[in-house]
Amino acid sequence: MREIVHIQAGQCGNQIGAKFWEVISDEHGIDPTGTYHGDSDLQLERINVYYNEASGGKYVPRAILVDLEPGTMDSVRAGPFGQIFRPDNFVFGQSGAGNNWAKGHYTEGAELVDSVLDVIRKEAESCDCLQGFQLTHSLGGGTGSGMGTLLISKIREEYPDRIMVTYSVVPSPKVSDTVVEPYNATLSVHQLVENTDETYCIDNEALYDICFRTLKLSNPTYGDLNHLVSATMSGVTTCLRFPGQLNADLRKLAVNMVPFPRLHFFMPGFAPLTSRGSQQYRALSVPELTQQMFDAKNMMAACDPRHGRYLTVAAIFRGRMSMKEVDEQMLNVQNKNSSYFVEWIPNNVKTAVCDIPPRGLKMSATFVGNSTAIQELFRRVSEQFTAMFRRKAFLHWYTGEGMDEMEFTEAESNMNDLVSEYQQYQDATAEDEGEFDEDEEVEEA
């Protein structure tokens, strides 16, 4: 089978990772002890993608939990599915990264990285045919961002032909933990542009807005935000976990979604949006699902897709529904909004349907868009970065760990280049390809 090895790094990465395992274990009928209690063969048909079958018929997640301090991992271990993980796969330091990317990437994290790679190697060796790795982390802290990107580049060295996917939580001024988040995020994006194949940008600002506006939660907690993240992660991995034809592995998804290697930052969306513990009374119709999942309010990245154009889109519908109706509605969306899809990639919207809906819903839809509007998110981080960097504010925390200012300057310009590339393809039309060829050569040099 085509296995995926999951890594969660840092506080945020471990919290959303733990929620991800709770949600998909439930969908596959696996209880907190790793025992199967399901009612459908579909639940087990591709269980090997994310789980190892251990002795006594127990299913163990192919998960590695990493942090530079023990706190979050202790709470994962004490949490509802804490006992399902393999105890040897908890790898943690004691010092913490103090929200400092340099500590995660160059000093504290670098000391721990070899013991993490040993565990990753062991997991990879138990795979029959490893398709790739997925990492959950945030870009604003120290461990998930600094050590997370260090792990990515080390894994890239050792497994250059395997797919690397990240679920990256991008910082936002509305839900901010520390003032240096723009530094950590820019340094991380600098790494992700070069070293990942697919990055799902999950944005705290968008999650906060969804909780506040759509779900009417007056005071959203991280628990509420993480509920949305886990629903989205469950949705985008549906094709990988259940039998189906379309985007059934990470590589096929990448081939469909990434027209240019650097432009692999996706905007996820989900419909219907529900709050934690709520039951939905009325199943949405296929037209409603389709309309909602393309709606800017349902995007997990704080960017408005109407400010850009879609290069590619993947949609995953879940539940019992008419395939014909799904196809009609998806065509309908494209025809009505054709100006928002680039015309120089024909058939750039792909749709998959899976019979098994998520818990508590009759039908749901998950949206993955590669939109040029994602540049808004990088622009936002870049502006905050520049404001501090031009005064060299807080830089001593980074140079004190051995970093050079030059690395900041490079990261800043790489992110600004990324923004310009998105802009370039947003403005492109089918006719004027001649001009691009020359640009391309300059960039390669």
From Swiss-Prot:
> Disordered: where is this region?
424-445
Cofactor(s) required for function per UniProt: Mg(2+)
A Pfam family hit:
Tubulin_C
Q: Kindly list the GO molecular function terms attached to this UniProt entry.
A: GTP binding; GTPase activity; metal ion binding; structural constituent of cytoskeleton
Q: Where does Mg(2+) bind?
A: 69
Q: Which UniProt keywords apply?
A: Cytoplasm, Cytoskeleton, GTP-binding, Magnesium, Metal-binding, Microtubule, Nucleotide-binding
Query: Tell me, what is an example of a GO biological process annotation in this record?
Result: microtubule-based process
Residues binding GTP are 11, 69, 138, 142-144, 204, 226
InterPro entries referenced in this protein's UniProt entry, alphabetically: Beta-tubulin_BS, Beta_tubulin, Tub_FtsZ_C, Tubulin, Tubulin/FtsZ-like_C, Tubulin/FtsZ_2-layer-sand-dom, Tubulin/FtsZ_GTPase_sf, Tubulin_C
Q: Name one GO cellular component term.
A: microtubule
* Subcellular location(s) of the protein: Cytoplasm, Cytoskeleton
Please list the residue ranges that the record marks as compositionally biased, kind Acidic residues: 429-445
* Predominant location: cytoplasm
Q: What does this protein do?
A: Tubulin is the major constituent of microtubules, a cylinder consisting of laterally associated linear protofilaments composed of alpha- and beta-tubulin heterodimers. Microtubules grow by the addition of GTP-tubulin dimers to the microtubule end, where a stabilizing cap forms. Below the cap, tubulin dimers are in GDP-bound state, owing to GTPase activity of alpha-tubulin.
The family note in this entry says:
Belongs to the tubulin family.
Subunit structure of this chain's protein: Dimer of alpha and beta chains. A typical microtubule is a hollow water-filled tube with an outer diameter of 25 nm and an inner diameter of 15 nM. Alpha-beta heterodimers associate head-to-tail to form protofilaments running lengthwise along the microtubule wall with the beta-tubulin subunit facing the microtubule plus end conferring a structural polarity. Microtubules usually have 13 protofilaments but different protofilament numbers can be found in some organisms and specialized cells.
Can you say what this protein is called? Tubulin beta-2 chain
Organism equals Echinococcus multilocularis
What's the encoding gene here?
Answer: TUB-2
